[in-house]
């Protein structure tokens, strides 16, 4: 019994909770929903009778009480001419990746509807400003943007629609729209390109027998002080045209278009792309002035240049659409990358020459021949070495050492005749003036009364660099800048 009562209580509470939730939702919907406006043709005679007879509301009611918005003006007669003009509030930059642009505009349409002529007893101005809620009670052109990707109306703080009814039956509608329009781009000359972006206004359902769009005379598109971050747009570059289209099976549909000519500003790419890549290429040429045997300095410099240019190419490729043709910027980046890579290849050729044994021996022979011609080579050079090994010693030093050895060694009764050979067996980096005949280091004076350091080694011999390796670096210093300058002359003369 208690269990059944508990279940009944639980079911009752659930029903009460659901009913409360439903009431709360309905109240929220009622608050958020705007009050529905009924056109005069939809109102009852009692409601119309409550309106004062001499009021403007009564005049509008008299105009619209028998008005059918489903039927166009001049039905079965001449087509309705709709005069169109546009005021551009803002113009967004072109997006290269999506190939579109966004504009915020006031779209204005004006046409004549004889059914809306103001009565003769209407006193006041020649135009009657009407609340936007009445817009849905009128017939209106079925205009749409043919190249539109997305669009939206504005309703902050009220619907941004302006409606005028003139005494002669002319109707003027102005509405604020934000539209994203497609713009197919030709990026062959990017970033020195000029783009032509269209805005096409077309009738959706009425053929040219019923409706015609006409640009307003004068300046149908008003453009005031619009600055774009990457493009220049001028009022003089705006073109107007007719784009009436034929659709098989239905006929011709009226269409008008405006073409915006946008010239890209190159300053951003000059500072952000061209200048850095040019400096990287020039930086890669510094290796031509570094000693050919300094591979620890030249190789990292070349690799850094190539990697920096490759990274720049990858970054820009991610920001641009993937097109099948080569852009002007691609030509520049590829050329810079090739110049950086060529400087690295040039050092590889220098290394081949530097490590070629035949060329090294030939260079040694050339140096020896040159010294011999100057009187410093041949036998004289051989005599001034320890044991003919090539280690230089002064003649005076050799004589002093020999004299010392003779004095010391001849006083020994057990000295063998071949003990003087120790002089010839000394290490090649020993100076005889610093050692006795037994190879022991001694202190000698340097002529100023000060003892010289023991076991003083001569400076290391300079590596032999073949002339061919030096000549390659010499040619590269002139050839690379000249070729890059020639490329710049051709490049800028074509693309600028």
Swiss-Prot record:
Activity control note: Channel opening is triggered by extracellular glycine. Heteropentameric channels composed of GLRB and GLRA1 are activated by lower glycine levels than homopentameric GLRA1.
Secretion signal, residue range per the UniProt entry: 1-22
Residues noted as binding glycine 2 in the record, renumbered to the chain: 250
Reaction catalysed by this enzyme: chloride(in) = chloride(out)
Keyword match Transmembrane helix: yes
Compartments where found: Postsynaptic cell membrane; Synapse; Cell projection, Dendrite; Cell membrane
Protein name: Glycine receptor subunit beta
Biological classification of the source: Eukaryota, Metazoa, Chordata, Craniata, Vertebrata
